[in-house]
C-alpha cells in the first residue's frame, strides 16, 4: 500500500485573496495557516477535518481502488486503502497539535460523472465509505455534499473550518477525462468488470441519507443577484 503524498501545488488564490494549495487525487494537506485548500472532485471524495479550538485543519482527496471485493467487507483491500487515507489525515492533524475528540468533518464528492459510472458505482462506494468511517471513528459530520451527477470544486479554509462548494458542468472536460481513466482502472486484471452491488438510479438533487442538519456549505463563484442561491457559512 503506497503512502499518501502531501500536496505541493502552492499558489496565490485571487478569488479568496490568500495563499492556497491545490490537491490532486491521492494527496492530503494539513495546516493551521489562514490559507485555502482547493480540489476538484468527480467520483473521488474529499474529507475536510477541522479542530475548532486548535484552529487547525486539513483535507484529503482519495478514491477506493476496486479489488472486486464486497464493498461492505471491512477487511477488503479497498477499505484498508480508504482507512489509510483517512488515518494519514487524522494522524498528521494530531501530530500538528489537533485533538481527535474535537475534530469535525465536512465531506464532498462521490458523484457519477460519466454515463457508465452509475453501473460501476465508484462514487457511491466512496461516499458510503467516508460516511461509515467517520461514524465508526465518532467524528461528527457537520456538512456534506455527496453523490449526484455533478463534479464539484471544493474550497476549505483549515484555519476557520469554512467550506465552500461549486457545482461544475456534468461533462467538464478535465474531470470527465480523469473519471474515464478511473473507470478503466475499475476493471479487474482479467479484463472483466468485477461483481458490483445493486445498480442505482441517479435522481437530480437526491438528498443525503439521514442528514443530521442542513449542510453549512457556502456556494462560491455564483452571482449574488441570483435569488435561488442561498448562501450559508460553513
From Swiss-Prot:
<dbReference type="Pfam" id="PF03975">
    <property type="entry name" value="CheD"/>
</dbReference>
<comment type="similarity">
    <text>Belongs to the CheD family.</text>
</comment>
<keyword id="KW-0378">Hydrolase</keyword>
<dbReference type="InterPro" id="IPR011324">
    <property type="entry name" value="Cytotoxic_necrot_fac-like_cat"/>
</dbReference>
<protein>
    <recommendedName>
        <fullName>Probable chemoreceptor glutamine deamidase CheD</fullName>
        <ecNumber>3.5.1.44</ecNumber>
    </recommendedName>
</protein>
<dbReference type="GO" id="GO:0006935">
    <property type="term" value="P:chemotaxis"/>
</dbReference>
<dbReference type="InterPro" id="IPR038592">
    <property type="entry name" value="CheD-like_sf"/>
</dbReference>
<dbReference type="GO" id="GO:0050568">
    <property type="term" value="F:protein-glutamine glutaminase activity"/>
</dbReference>
<dbReference type="InterPro" id="IPR005659">
    <property type="entry name" value="Chemorcpt_Glu_NH3ase_CheD"/>
</dbReference>
<comment type="function">
    <text>Probably deamidates glutamine residues to glutamate on methyl-accepting chemotaxis receptors (MCPs), playing an important role in chemotaxis.</text>
</comment>
<keyword id="KW-0145">Chemotaxis</keyword>
Amino acid at each position: 500500500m503506497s503512502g499518501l503524498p502531501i500536496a505541493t501545488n502552492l499558489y496565490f488564490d485571487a478569488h479568496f485573496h490568500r495563499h492556497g494549495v491545490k490537491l490532486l487525487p491521492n494527496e492530503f494537506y494539513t495546516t493551521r495557516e489562514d490559507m485555502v485548500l482547493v480540489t476538484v472532485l468527480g467520483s473521488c471524495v474529499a474529507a475536510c477535518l477541522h479542530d475548532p479550538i486548535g484552529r487547525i485543519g486539513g483535507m484529503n482527496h482519495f478514491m477506493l481502488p476496486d479489488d472486486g471485493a464486497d464493498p461492505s467487507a471491512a477487511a477488503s483491500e479497498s477499505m484498508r486503502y480508504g482507512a489509510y487515507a483517512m488515518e494519514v489525515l487524522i494522524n498528521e492533524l494530531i501530530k500538528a497539535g489537533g485533538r481527535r475528540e474535537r475534530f469535525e468533518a465536512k465531506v464532498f464528492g462521490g458523484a457519477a460523472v460519466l454515463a457508465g459510472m452509475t453501473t460501476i458505482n465508484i462514487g457511491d462506494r466512496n461516499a458510503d465509505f467516508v460516511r461509515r468511517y467517520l461514524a465508526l471513528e465518532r467524528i461528527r459530520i457537520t456538512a456534506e455534499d455527496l453523490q449526484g451527477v455533478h463534479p464539484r470544486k471544493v474550497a476549505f479554509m483549515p484555519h476557520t473550518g469554512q467550506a465552500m462548494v461549486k457545482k461544475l458542468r456534468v461533462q467538464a472536460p478535465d474531470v470527465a477525462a480523469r473519471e474515464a481513466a478511473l473507470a478503466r482502472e475499475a476493471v479487474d486484471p482479467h479484463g472483466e468488470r468485477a461483481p458490483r452491488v445493486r445498480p442505482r438510479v441517479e435522481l437530480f438533487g437526491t438528498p443525503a441519507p439521514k442528514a443530521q442538519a442542513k449542510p453549512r456549505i457556502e456556494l462560491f463563484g455564483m452571482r449574488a443577484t441570483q435569488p435561488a442561491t442561498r448562501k450559508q457559512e460553513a
